[in-house]
């Protein structure tokens, strides 16, 4: 009978890859871990790690779907080479899979499968050599895709070795230590044993002991900040916001034909609730990061969605038209769905600021002004779609609708002009010159001049309301270039802190659809006039 605990432990350790199915690691959610230049809750670390590895926060594994906490904790508790046999590493690029001889229908592969591939190491070595010759070189094509896969393989190695789990504050210096390299390696033993024998109570008790020990050491981030980030990560406020916006849009559409007044009120409540949820999410990011939430593409997308609804609600408060909400909701919903569903393109992680951005005054004034102008132009885009949609449906939009569009464009131009001037002042302060024809500066100026020309044409009588609506749709393409194109397509200039990759097929599809929409509206308008 004395052999029973030993046999249980041995059998569980031997099949540790399956043990994660029987124990919940939620007791570790608020454990503080240092990663990516900052200290964050373990829950955030787990979800970000699996998202970087696999593209999602849950993946199919061993006959079931496992979430990030389960997988990342399982790797930590086990830290054995068996995890290199699991299909956890994302390879999404079809040309690369064809080049490597991998099954193009699969997206996830094991570390062992990739490391034994004869072609992948050569592509990774070529990418490394390109970077060695020129550290600023921009990888492209198969080299870039292979380099990304190599980074994921390196991340899994670091997780399996235990080096990624930096939860012990140092006595001196800035880097935290993994438990397996701390002076007291017994800290992890009770957790591992409880995990191995599937002892939920013992695991929770050991996790609580580790949390208590960590809180007694320093330096530690404020407990409220860790609790806030954990709540923010679990609440998914932006997801619930777009769901409420979508519901408001549906109610607003249905109320066009019946129960108009009551439907408008319901839509207002739903949109307002979504707005408050989104505001809470943005405020949480501000408190967690200690800065405005506009330092990368993900944050700017959710901020522009927020600004679009904000301007719509302000205009609706004044005019009670329904048009502004009807134009804003599709833009906000599409933006938030994009931010929620494309984590490999729009990185939602909170990162430390690059040196040039470490000035909250200029970050707040310049960047918020520019991005709020994008929001106003996005609202104008939505209102223009409402007007052109009526034409396509065989109705003539009222002059009032075109007046709403004109006022929205005025707000956008004011904000873009202000933001561009403030950007020049900041550039002079940071880089010693007001203007240098940097791609970001150039396209901001092109967008500003394009919208000014659009309003000038309306004032001077070169075109009427219909031309204004067509122009609002086409001019937004210049905003898209300044916002997305410079950062993700050109990838050049001094604004490198906003650079990224991916999403080009989505953007190209959007541009194509807009051109088709404008063409149909033009043809339909000619038919109506005839």
Task: Describe these PLM feature segments.
Residues 19-231:
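Soluble extramembrane regions of membrane proteins in the secretory/endomembrane system
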Residues 6-15:
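Bacterial N-terminal signal peptides
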Residues 22, 213-235, 280-301, 344-368, ...:
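Membrane-interface interhelical loops and short amphipathic "cap" helices
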Residues 261-276, 322-331, 400-413, 464-475, ...:
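Membrane-interfacial loop-to-transmembrane alpha-helix junctions, especially the N-terminal start
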Residues 338-367, 372, 388-389, 462, ...:
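Extended, aromatic/histidine-rich regions of cofactor-dependent oxidoreductases associated
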Residues 273-279, 303-308, 332, 409-418, ...:
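Hydrophobic membrane-spanning alpha-helices of multi-pass integral membrane proteins
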Residues 245-249, 302-316, 368-387, 444-458, ...:
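Hydrophobic cores of alpha-helical transmembrane segments in multi-pass inner/ER membrane proteins
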Residues 220-333, 339-342, 349-352:
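Core alpha-helical transmembrane segments of integral membrane proteins
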